[in-house]
Amino acid sequence: MQAYNTQTGIVCPLDRANVDTDQIIAKQFLKSIKRTGFGVNLFDDWRYLDEGYPGQDNSTRVINPDFILNKPRYQGASILLARRNFGCGSSREHAPWALSEYGFRTVIAPSFADIFYNNCFKNGMLPIVLDEEIVDSLMKATFANEGYELTADLERQVVITPTGEEYAFEVDDFRKHCLLNGLDDIGLTLQQSDAIKEYEQKMMQKTPWIFNEVRA
């Protein structure tokens, strides 16, 4: 997993509350067993005027010119500014996969659905909770200034505006450690590989019949 320390990027304002995971990545795209290929269908029902399906050539589809991600000024955005309860609805890790593959590494909102919030950390993304008044202010600044950028500093736990204002955010120490060091669940397990091998050796001596059955 790619480590996260500090990110500066163009902000895309998604001025909608209660954006659920089916809106982030629609159910028809969940059939793939891979973790890749979802970015092109991020917010599919909003980005396109025609219905999408897996394996479709999106270059032939009808773009919705009114949707925020399709506006030229937000091309290349890597920080998503959202409203309360972002990522609600059904549990699907495909949602952060789609956001990440599209190019978003940071999502800022007044609140997140718990499962989505946890899944972000497992996939190298930083979900930042800021007060609704602060999000309102950032929304206004983003709409008013083309190319508006923010900096998210995980080490210091602050969001920094172009004029130097800093907004502190909370993050669990363990999650912070994992992001700073690029550790997902597999990476954390591999860090304990010596201890795991030592445990297995002890168990092979204590209960050898279990391992015999496994080998068989």
From Swiss-Prot:
EC primary class: lyase
InterPro entries linked to this entry: 3-IsopropMal_deHydase_ssu, Aconitase/3IPM_dehydase_swvl, AconitaseA/IPMdHydase_ssu_swvl, IPMI_Swivel, LeuD
Any one of the GO CC terms: 3-isopropylmalate dehydratase complex
Residues forming coiled coils: none
GO molecular function: 3-isopropylmalate dehydratase activity
Catalytic activity: (2R,3S)-3-isopropylmalate = (2S)-2-isopropylmalate
Pathway(s) the chain acts in: Amino-acid biosynthesis; L-leucine biosynthesis; L-leucine from 3-methyl-2-oxobutanoate: step 2/4
Keyword field: Amino-acid biosynthesis, Branched-chain amino acid biosynthesis, Leucine biosynthesis, Lyase
Gene3D superfamilies: Aconitase, domain 4
Pfam families named among the record's database cross-references: Aconitase_C
Assigned EC number: 4.2.1.33
UniProt similarity note: Belongs to the LeuD family. LeuD type 1 subfamily.
Assembly: Heterodimer of LeuC and LeuD.
Function: Catalyzes the isomerization between 2-isopropylmalate and 3-isopropylmalate, via the formation of 2-isopropylmaleate.
PANTHER family in the cross-refs: 3-ISOPROPYLMALATE DEHYDRATASE SMALL SUBUNIT, 3-ISOPROPYLMALATE DEHYDRATASE SMALL SUBUNIT 2-RELATED-RELATED
HAMAP family: LeuD_type1
The protein, known as: 3-isopropylmalate dehydratase small subunit
Lineage, highest ranks first: Bacteria, Pseudomonadati, Pseudomonadota, Gammaproteobacteria, Moraxellales
